[in-house]
A protein has these predicted regions:
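A generic fold-level signal
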Residues: 2-4, 16, 75-76, 105-107
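Active-site beta-strand termini and strand-to-loop segments that position acidic
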Residues: 11-15, 26, 83-85
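Conserved Nudix-box catalytic region and its N-terminal flanking loop in Nudix hydrolases
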Residues: 17-59
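Short, solvent-exposed aromatic-acidic interface loops
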Residues: 26-30, 99-104
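A short coil-to-beta-strand element that immediately follows conserved catalytic motifs
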Residues: 59-69
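Active-site-adjacent beta-strand/loop module that shapes the phosphate/pyrophosphate-binding cleft
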Residues: 71-99, 110-117, 126-140
Length: 145
């Protein structure tokens, strides 16, 4: 049996209000999602995360900070990456997906949310798997600027 692999991206940045996480409005249910997507054959988790960020959000030149953890859900190995955003990304923006997957042509509405205890209630199920680790590591990771 082949195990499918998926990368979830916790893209973070510093703001005047504190650490923030990039999310988009879910098209399927109330709440927000993070950028995510299936790995292509031979891709590492980091490579998948970088590709998905570029395809779904139009963002490149991110800094890979760490792997927060992995879960197994419905036969799918889901890895969660902590990445730092480059400067200059707007507070809110839209991007139309590129690439050859199901996201191609889909327009996503992105925004930044504060990284705190309220985040868990705002994210759709599955995207919230490593929120505690995100909260614990984000301030430290961003404090090194």
């Amino acid at each position: 049996m082949t195990v499918r692999k998926k990368a979830f991206v916790y893209l973070i940045r510093n703001s005047e209000a504190g650490p923030q996480l990039l999310v988009f409005e879910s098209l399927d249910e109330p709440g927000f999602e993070v950028v995510k997507g299936q790995s292509k054959p031979g891709e590492t988790l980091e490579q998948t995360a970088r590709r998905e960020l570029e395809e779904e959000a139009g963002i490149a030149d991110v800094l890979f900070l760490s792997r927060l953890g992995t879960t197994l859900w419905n036969g799918e190995l889901q890895g969660f990456c902590l990445m730092k955003a480059p400067p200059g990304i707007p507070a809110r923006f839209q991007h139309t997906g590129t690439g050859d997957g199901i996201d191609c042509g889909v327009t996503y509405s992105f925004r930044w949310l504060p990284i705190d205890d309220t985040l868990r209630a705002l994210l759709v199920q599955g995207c919230d798997a490593f929120i505690d680790e995100l909260i614990a590591r984000a301030a430290v990771a961003l404090g090194r600027e």
